[in-house]
């Protein structure tokens, strides 16, 4: 954790996911006109509407009263089913391209898979009735994936999804014309040129002026903890040491580490704490990637 006044309202959290797969199973192809896009996984609800923009706006102590619905509801069992499905060699080779449903929901997850698309929002599986076209298009409900497959492979892919007890529905088709079309209740509610989407509607240019770094304002000469620099200038080494220890950024992270199980999957090579008494912080992360034989 990094402690700084700028993170009082919103924390900065950074995570990473790594995986490995045999090269023969990783297919990277273009989406061709006529290809079918299948939505599989969890159903779509109102949770997550506006989450992408909500994470970038100013929040206060009253935000929870109006922004609670922006937080997606997780569905771990369905996520596990998707993982099992994608680990099957015969399934991964059918997928030409795929995308996860992060920020923007259907409009982005499917909208990024090809230049020309026609999406039928009425086919999107719903958690409950009453969702309008906008909600179906932007909901960021989790545990969903969009995959592009050849028309001849649609039934085969749907069969594999059924074997994993996953809902899978063809919801879009790749078109020749570079336009994103979203249909709802038989009518287009979005019909935009790809060129417009790629440029945000305008040709953009910018001029940049970079100042020559100043020796007097050298960032690397500044102390992260100002009190340390002040004490050192006074020649008070002990005071500088105490000032540094008083900063939260040098405190032990053991309490945070203990909130997570580092032994899950039996893949950890070096645990977060090691040494004779298991109290010495490990300065790196080393783990085995889970692969099938």
Where are these regions (language model features)?
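Glycine/proline-enriched, intrinsically flexible loops and inter-domain linkers
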Residues: 1-293
């Amino acid at each position: 954790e990094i402690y700084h006044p700028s993170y009082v309202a919103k924390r900065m959290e950074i995570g990473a996911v790594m995986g490995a797969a045999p090269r023969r199973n990783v297919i990277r192809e273009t989406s061709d006109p006529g290809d079918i896009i299948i939505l599989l996984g969890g159903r779509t609800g109102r949770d997550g509407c506006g989450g992408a923009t909500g994470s970038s706006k100013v929040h206060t102590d009253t935000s929870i009263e109006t922004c609670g619905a922006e937080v997606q509801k997780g569905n771990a069992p369905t996520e596990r089913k998707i993982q099992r499905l994608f680990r099957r060699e015969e399934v991964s080779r059918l997928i030409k391209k795929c995308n996860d449903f992060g920020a923007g929901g259907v409009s982005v997850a499917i909208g990024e898979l090809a230049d020309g698309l026609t999406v039928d929002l009425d086919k999107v599986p719903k958690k409950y009735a009453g969702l309008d076209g906008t909600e179906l298009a932007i909901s960021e409900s989790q545990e969903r994936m969009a995959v592009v497959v050849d028309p001849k492979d649609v039934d085969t892919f749907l069969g594999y999804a059924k074997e994993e007890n996953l809902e899978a529905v063809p919801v879009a088709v790749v078109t020749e014309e570079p336009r994103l079309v979203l249909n709802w209740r038989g009518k287009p509610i979005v019909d935009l040129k790809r060129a417009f989407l790629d440029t945000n509607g305008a040709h953009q240019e910018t001029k940049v002026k970079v100042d020559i770094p100043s020796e007097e304002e050298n960032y690397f000469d500044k102390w992260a903890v100002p009190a340390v620099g002040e004490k050192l200038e006074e020649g008070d080494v002990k005071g500088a040491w105490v000032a540094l220890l008083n900063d939260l950024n040098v405190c032990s992270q053991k309490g945070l580490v203990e909130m997570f199980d580092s032994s899950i999957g039996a893949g950890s090579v070096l645990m977060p704490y090691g040494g004779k008494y298991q109290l010495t912080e490990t300065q790196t992360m080393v783990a085995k990637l889970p692969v099938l034989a």
